Each structure stands twice: as C-alpha cells, then as structure tokens.
Amino acid sequence: MSVEVDKSSHSKPKIEKKSKRNKRKWLNDENKTHVTASEAAIERLKKSASFSQAAQQALKQSRKEDNERDIEMQDVDAEAQPHDLLPIPQPSVEDFVDSKPHVKNITSVLPKWLAEPITVDPNTTVEFSSLNISSKLVERLQKQNITRGFAVQAAVLPLLLQDGRHGPMYSYGGDVCVSAATGSGKTLSYVIPIVQCLSHRTVPRLRCVVIVPTRELTVQVAKTFEYYMSGAGLQVCAWTGQKSLRHETYQLNGDENECRIDVLVSTPGRLVDHIRNDESFSLQHLRYMVIDEADRLLDQSFQDWVDTVMMEISHPKCLQNKSNILDLDQNISPTFLPDIDTLLPYRLPSPLQKLVFSATLTRDPSKIASLKLHNPRLVLVQNKDMEVDDGGEIEDDAIVFSVPPTLQEYHVSVSSEKPILLYHLIHSKNLTNILCFVKSNEAAARLHRLLELIHESLNQSFSCGLFTSSLSRDERKKIISRFATGDLNLLVCSDLMARGIDVANTQNVINYDPPLSVRSYVHRIGRTARAGREGFAWTLVQSHEGHHFSKLVKQLRRTLPIKRIKIEFSHISEEFVVAYDKALEALRVEVFNSRYPQQKSFLT
C-alpha cells in the first residue's frame, strides 16, 4: 500500500513541474510574439514617418513650383500688349505633299480603268463596211438604211469584234463598261458583235443573257436580236413574266430537254425565278452577259439578282451534285463514283464576258464590284475637255452624265396654271410628236383627260394618248404603235416610258413635272434626239422649282446651252381660257360622280 501511495505522491509534483515549464514556454512565445509585433509596428511607423516626410517635401516643392509659375504668368500679363489676330501656324504644303506623294487628287482613289477611260468624241462616226463585220450583217444594216455608226459604235464594235474573233468558246478580252447618252446606239453596239460571234457555234446553248429593267425594253431588245439573227441559224427568247415558268422553260428547252435558245433577254426578277425554281436552267455555257440600263438595275435589288446570278455563274447548280449529272453512273467506273461529289474543281475557266451599258453609268467602285468584272475597260462618249474639272477631280461625285449633242433644251418658266400654259406652249410653238412626262400615274391620267376636254370644247382635232404602268401590256403596245405611226400627236406618260424604249419619230419631250433626279432627267429627254436626229426638251418650271432644276441641269455635259423662255397667263387667248375653265368644271364633275355615284343629280 505504501508503494502505491508513494507513486501517487511522487507523480503529482511531476505534473505540476511540467505545467510550470509549459507556462513558462508559453509566456516566452507570447513575449516573442509581442516583441515581433512591436518591432513590425515600429518598422511600419518608421516607414510611415519617412513617407510622410517625403510627401511633405514633395508638397512643398509643388507649392514652390506653383508660386514660380504664377509669378511667370504675372510677368507675361504685365508685358502683354494688344495686337491683331495672327493665323495659326500650318504645315507647309510642300512638306505635306512630300510626306505623302500618293495623295494627288481624287482620281488616284479610283481603279486605273475607271480613272483612265477610253474617251470618244460624240461627233465620231465610222463606216460599218470598214469594220470587221460579216457581209450578211452589213447587208441587214443597209436594209435599215444604216451605213455609218455613231460614236459609241465606233468605240465599242472594234473592241468586241476583236474579243469574239475566235468564236463562242474563247474570249481574249476583258469586260467592257460603256457610258453614252440615250439614243446613241448602245443596243446595236452589242447586238452586232454578239450575233457575229455566236454565228460560229455548232451546238445550241444558252450563250448570252441580256438583263433589262422593264418588260417593254425586253421585247424591244429581243426584236433587234431577231432581225439581225435572220439567216444565221440563231434563236432569241424574251422572258417578261407574262407566261408561267413551265411555258418559259419549254421555250428554252422544248420537249427533248435540249437547249434550243442562243440568246435570252429577261428582266432580273424573272431570271432569278428560273435560277431558284427551275432545276434544268443553267448559265454554265454563257459567253456574254449584257446589263442594259445598268444604273437602275444596280440601284435596286430585284430579289438580290446580282448575287444570285453571280453565284450561278461561278457555281452552276447542275454541277454541284453528281446526282444532277445525267448517265454519270453509266459512263464512269463504280470505283471512282464515291470520289466524285462535284465537278466544279474540274471545270475549265469560263469564256464569259460582261458588257455593262448605261446613259448614267456610276463610277462608284463599291457598286461595280458586285458585278465581279474581269480586266474591265471603260468607254465614255463625251468631249475630252469635259472629262474632269479644273482641279483634276471627277465631276459629280464620280458619276458620268451626258446629253445627246443634237438636243436643244428649254427652261420654261410658268405659273401655277400649268395645264393651260402647256396647251398654249404646244400650239404657239407648233409642237408635234410629243412625249409629256408627269410625276405619277394618277397625275398623268388627270392631265390626259383635261387636255381631251379642252380639245372637245375648242372642237380641235388634236389627238392625245395615255401611257402608264396601270395599262395592260397589250394596251401599251397599241398606244406605242399609234404614236409611232402618227395617229397620236401627244402621249402623256409616266417615267415607265423613260427607260430605254425607242419610240420612233419622237421630236419633242415635255417635262410637265420636273424630274427629281438628274438620272430621271437624262432618261426622259433621251427619248428624243436619238440616232443623230434633232430633238427638243421643254421643262415647265415654277418659281419654287427653279433653284432645284438649275442645280440639277448643271451636272450635265452638253453641246448646246439651255435656252430660257417665260410663259405668263396674260399671253393666253381668251378662247383658250374659256375652254380651260369649262374643261376644269367638267373634270370636277366626272371625278365627283366617279367617287359618289349615288349623288350624281346633286351636281348635274
């Protein structure tokens, strides 16, 4: 028992001793921690004090500099004296030009083919017999009493005839863009070389597509091709959208699904319809693509026709998939069939040549780039001294406008009584074969009816017709035929007539409503003075329209200056005034009765 007690009594002091050692160790550690913390705090205080001292010194230095600056400003103010304003120093022109020698003028921004066009004087002519044209085509020209070509033909025909001398399978020239006044013979300048080139073909293929903006122009161009194709074994087809897609496909391929058309004339929308919806339609054999009235076609999307047509030309859908290639499995070993997904990599370069024509052809590279032209050349029919202004810059923001050299323009100042002033102008100047352009279909119909009522009141034989987009195609054809034969002396029309349509014997153009753009003006007045004939353009301008019209016509290049005349209401005979008042009242009654048929008795 004593042993156990002793063990317990001895173990207790050992525990106490160990506890004291741990306590002392803990205190030592705490003291060290406090010392370390104190030392760190002291170091931070020292650094803070040092920083504060440095900051104070920097602040003193800053205040000293501010004081010195204030003293300097006071000295300057004290010495300043009043004087005249002096120009701000500018870098010398020589230094600027030397530092950027490539900055010459705006023409350096354009591609070379746009900045350096082929310029032809409007008075240039050429004998067709002197060109490399076949005897058959020369004979067809002579039957139309055409022996000499105009300026655009003198410039374009040699280029295209040279490019097409090896037939439809080859092309050694680049694309061609042509800007010439309306009525200058642009259509004939591409019809002749295309017919001559394609006459050497062996197998019928769709080798030429002509894209035009209107149905009327489609028919007109197709008739021109048809006349000069006579005896050459070639076929032309016009797509206007009047027939179904199936019928037009039959025109192209017939019963045997073999192409039998060489030249297709179409509006852009109808062409896109066939590309997207007709599996048998293909442009893979094209030799020529003609874009007529290009300014209008490029300004409007027409179902994205440019991108759609360019894609079909570069990647024909008939070559995209081997399943579209007839009898492929019968002519190629089955071993190689799995490797043939498309024939595009094996396609030979296309001989396609693009021909772009317009009276107001843009020089905007961004618009022309969408056509993906290859080695293009630009032909301008204009006087060389009018090509650029005195500063060497392209006029009118890089757009070319020209007027037929045989056209005489008139600026006619009028008051608000325009219908009777128009009637007075026609009779006082003895005008005949007149196209009168009005801003809308409704305004054209109203003016046409008012002129008819004036004729009836005066018992005069003055025939007047109406031509607008609201008429059917057959009605338009009849109207144009009557005007061409002289049965109609005056044709009131909308801008539908202004685009490329060649109405025979048009001598006078009257702008009853001034056009809103220079392009519209050029295309309107281009209906007269065609093919070297004399023509006259009369624009009725009210006082509030004078500034706009004067600014518009300044953008045009012309041979003859504009003449100004003024017609006042006091110039009109009393007989015309009475007839005009009666016609206005009769027209008012007709309009009211057409709108309110149940109240006819109220006005009658």
From Swiss-Prot:
Pfam families registered for this protein in UniProt: DEAD (PF00270), Helicase_C (PF00271)
GO CC terms of this entry: cytosol; nucleolus; nucleus
Localization per Swiss-Prot or TrEMBL: Nucleus, Nucleolus
Gene3D superfamilies, per database record: P-loop containing nucleotide triphosphate hydrolases (3.40.50.300)
InterPro entries (alphabetical): DEAD/DEAH_box_helicase_dom, Helicase_ATP-bd, Helicase_C-like, P-loop_NTPase, RNA-helicase_DEAD-box_CS
Start-end of Basic and acidic residues biased regions: 1-16
Domain named Helicase C-terminal: residues: 406-573
EC number from the UniProt entry: 3.6.4.13
Major localisation: nucleus
Coiled-coil blocks: none
Locus of motif DEAD box: 292-295
Catalytic activity, reaction form: ATP + H2O = ADP + phosphate + H(+)
Low complexity: compositionally biased ranges: 51-60
Spans through the membrane: none
Motif position, Q motif: 149-157
Binding residues annotated for ATP, in chain numbering: 180-187
Domain Helicase ATP-binding: 167-379
Gene Ontology MF terms in the entry: ATP binding; ATP hydrolysis activity; RNA binding; RNA helicase activity
Function field: ATP-binding RNA helicase involved in the biogenesis of 60S ribosomal subunits and is required for the normal formation of 25S and 5.8S rRNAs.
Subunit relationships: Associated with pre-ribosomal particles.
Protein name: ATP-dependent RNA helicase dbp6
Upper taxonomic lineage: Eukaryota, Fungi, Dikarya, Ascomycota, Taphrinomycotina
